[in-house]
Amino acid sequence: MLTSGHTDTSRGRSGSSDDDATGHSPGRHSRHRGGGRPRRRRRFAAALFGLLGVLLAVAVPLLPVVQDTTTITWPGPGPLAPVNAPLVNFQPQSLTATIPCAAATSADARSIQPASLLATTPPGSADGAAVAMVLQVADGKLTLISRGQALGTFSLGTLPLGTIPVSPERCMITISSDATGTTASAGPHQFVTVDQDVRPQVTGIYSVLDDKRDPVKGLAVQITPDTRFQSTPHPIKLAAIALAVVAVLISLMLLHRLDGRIGRRAPRLLPSGWWRPTGRDATVLAVLAVWVVIGGITSDDGYILTMIRTSSDMGYVGNYYRWFNVPEAPFGWPYELYALWAEISTTPPWLRLPSFVMGGVCWMLISREVLPRLGREVRRSAAAGWAAAAVFLAFWLPYNNGLRLEPVVAIGSLLALCAVERAVATRRLLPLALGLLAAAFTVAATPTGFIAVAPFLVAVRPLVRLLHQHASVSGWPAVIGPIFGAGLLVLVVIFADQTLAGLLEATRIRTAIGPSLSWFQEATRYQELFSDKADGALARRFPVLL
């Protein structure tokens, strides 16, 4: 008969064997051997569903979307008249124009000053000449200007002399402009060729041409707005997203079953007394509740509110004020939830309720999960608890009472920390996978969310040892599959209605325009904190110095 000491030695020597891992000899406990096949099935299923979740999550950025497209055409039905059509992205994806040569000659003949045949900003605009495209004619000479630069000229006076082998009635001036270049021609003569992006800003279509005095037959302007980011997921993409979520959930449930081989018995998710309120809880929640009503707004509340209110029209959350309104992706998924919340009301107390709820959850995690892990003296000290409450409020009130995403970072980082601590303490992998899931969504919320990765880096040695212990019993595929699936599941949220190409383009635009600070420029934040600007207010400076 094997003693318990021999059982432990047997498990350590051959942990990869199902029989040795239980400490029983094959012969004497053959009645229990039937459990080996279900365990092998669970290992195989955990690896299979975990790998399936990983593959589907990675495939989501590459799957198709349905792009909303629109075209502005001019002139419309009725009398010829200018049209206002300001583009949110400023530049169009493409612009084409066809203007009869006879109309240009007619407008030139009746105009004393240069006649604007086509302009993309209103005449007389103070800054229009620097950003618009203008085709003008003066004394029989065509000139195409884009963004303040003369691209080329052509003399119309040669047309009646037969230098162009078409009749003046059939002669057309054509313009084509997109991201790859701009061309212009009069009949078969091309007088503009630019192999770079000189697309103009478009606020409308304006011209001096008059359909009652000028022969405008054949006049046409077509503008395609840049709607690359206005898309919805294709049914194939929706199916992949749903399957990825289901596969990862199943793999995590199977991982929970496999945890019993190595890990200690799973403790209750929320121990008894977790919800029992204390005086500190009442004080913290009361202060947070009062601050919802009387607290000052954060510096970006109005900025973010406009972004989320325009998202319903755009089809995505973009930076309305900067970067040509490209999507916030890969960051900013909480803004999608804020946009739904703001549809109910935009009053400040209502908009602050999410941060109030997250503040309450953060305090519960700090007081119930973090402080007790700091030792018996801290756990039993009322002074330590009240000090923690004071520091928490000192940070939360000036920084997190609004629509900024720091509350999401705070709650996500705390969840990751608590999950890592529980994984190491219980020797179970499910908390590790859930913590990685929380960290991934925190990182995808805002760049400062990378702080949620810190608990994994600090505990890397015990976590690697834990992975080896479980892999020796269940195999690496069954261990790594569900964990990787949990970490990559955030991709289905980031790329739910965007593509990888769209995200890369949005990132390129933000980086090119800036400002974009490198990691070694972190000191800039502290310069702002001690400046005489709003970021240097005493309320913001105090908790950092504390």
Regions found by a protein language model. Name each.
Residues 3-11, 18-65, 227-291:
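Start-transfer (signal-anchor) and selected internal transmembrane alpha helices
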Residues 45-121, 125-133, 137-140, 273-301, ...:
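Transmembrane signal-anchor helices characteristic of membrane glycosylation enzymes that use polyprenol
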Residues 79, 83-95, 100-231:
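Extended repeat-based interaction scaffolds and adjacent low-complexity, acidic/S/T/P-biased segments
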Residues 218-230, 332-345, 508-539:
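Juxtamembrane membrane-water interface segments that cap and precede transmembrane helices
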Residues 287-380, 394-403, 410, 532:
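Active-site lumenal/periplasmic loops and adjacent helix-entry segments of GT-C-fold
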Residues 364-365, 379-461:
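Membrane-embedded helix bundles of polyisoprenyl
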Residues 422-423, 451-485:
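Perimembrane helix-loop-helix junctions
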Residues 476-524:
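Membrane-lumen/periplasm interface segments of specific transmembrane helices
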